[in-house]
């Protein structure tokens, strides 16, 4: 009787692997927990292998900053169906050698995060542009190696771009950004923050080319002035947020219209800013009757 009951039990691994376990169970577990299953038994090791070959999203932050490069390469060497790839926690060691094979065999990527991956070269971005025609969102923040040539390649080949983060990509100048936005008219989110090379020229071209723009980050773009912000207000009716902190030449005369449209700004109106400064100095904010 006991033997019959044991034979009638359904074990986890008895369920269809590719139709049930991988898409409906493993896909909801943190990656580090999935990898730990490899140590349970040989069947579980095989199951995890199938998962890694078929997973659509790979987020290195789920494994922490200690992910060895050999482990990383082994995990993804047989995957050809990735759609989202987040490698920001690999920034200490990721080079073209590790990235290029993965990019070369995954042509369905729509999201790539290479934030602070400073050891890559332009070769990686060129490879992305040639291998990932469906790319929609790419983060290249603090990647000093991004230059005009690699940016032109991205603009020429990735026609579906909707969001790009170029924070602190200091090799880029107005001409590179202008070329990018002329080719990427679907852009909804763009960060050009912390780049002293960016001026009104790039911002005005962005406004005129990307009419559906919703989010623009110009933090620390010291050469940006009121004229380009007015152009932005004129052409980008869908704008939802604008960051201009530390843009000392951008004043309320250009921000006022955006504020009236309830665009989220990261700088306070002049009166509120003055009250905050006064509070910092004297330790309290005076009561002011604003209705007078």
Curated annotation (Swiss-Prot):
It comes from the Eukaryota. Pathway: Protein modification; protein ubiquitination. One of its GO terms (cellular component) is SCF ubiquitin ligase complex. Residues 12-59 form the F-box domain. The keyword Repeat applies. GO terms for biological process: bone mineralization; dorsal/ventral pattern formation; G2/M transition of mitotic cell cycle; positive regulation of BMP signaling pathway; protein ubiquitination; SCF-dependent proteasomal ubiquitin-dependent protein catabolic process. It is found in: Cytoplasm. InterPro entries: F-box-like_dom_sf, F-box_dom, Leu-rich_rpt_Cys-con_subtyp, LRR_dom_sf. It holds the Pfam family F-box. LRR repeats lie at residues 134-155, 160-181, 186-207, 212-233, 238-259. The keyword Transmembrane does not apply. Its main location: cytoplasm. Keywords: Cytoplasm, Leucine-rich repeat, Repeat, Ubl conjugation pathway. Belongs to the FBXL15 family. Part of the SCF (SKP1-CUL1-F-box) E3 ubiquitin-protein ligase complex SCF(FBXL15). Substrate recognition component of a SCF (SKP1-CUL1-F-box protein) E3 ubiquitin-protein ligase complex which mediates the ubiquitination and subsequent proteasomal degradation of target proteins. Acts as a positive regulator of the BMP signaling pathway. Required for dorsal/ventral pattern formation. This is F-box/LRR-repeat protein 15.
């Amino acid at each position: 009787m006991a033997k019959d009951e044991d034979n009638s039990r359904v074990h986890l691994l008895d369920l269809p692997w590719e139709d049930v376990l991988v898409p409906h169970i493993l896909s909801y577990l943190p990656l580090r927990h999935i990898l730990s299953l490899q140590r349970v038994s040989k069947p579980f090791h095989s199951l995890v292998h199938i998962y890694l070959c078929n997973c659509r999203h790979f987020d290195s932050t789920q494994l922490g900053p200690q992910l060895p490069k050999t482990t990383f390469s082994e995990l993804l060497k047989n995957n050809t169906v990735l759609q989202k790839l987040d490698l920001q926690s690999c920034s200490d060691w990721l080079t073209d050698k590790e990235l290029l094979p993965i990019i070369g065999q995954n042509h369905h990527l729509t999201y790539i995060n290479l934030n602070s991956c400073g050891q890559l070269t332009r070769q990686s971005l060129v490879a992305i542009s040639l291998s990932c025609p469906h790319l929609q969102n790419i983060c290249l923040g603090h990647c000093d190696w991004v230059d005009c040539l690699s940016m032109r390649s991205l603009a020429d080949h990735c026609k579906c771009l909707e969001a790009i983060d170029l924070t602190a990509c200091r090799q880029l100048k107005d001409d590179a950004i202008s070329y990018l936005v002329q080719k990427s008219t679907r852009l909804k989110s763009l960060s050009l923050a912390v780049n002293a090379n960016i001026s009104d020229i790039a911002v005005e071209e962005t406004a005129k080319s990307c009419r559906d723009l919703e989010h623009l980050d110009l933090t620390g773009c010291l050469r940006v002035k009121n004229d380009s912000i007015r152009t932005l207000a004129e052409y980008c009716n869908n704008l939802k947020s604008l960051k201009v902190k530390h843009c000392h030449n951008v004043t309320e005369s250009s921000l006022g219209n955006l504020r009236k449209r309830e665009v989220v700004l990261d700088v306070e109106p002049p009166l509120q800013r003055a009250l905050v400064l006064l509070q910092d100095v004297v330790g309290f904010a005076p009561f002011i009757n604003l209705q007078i």
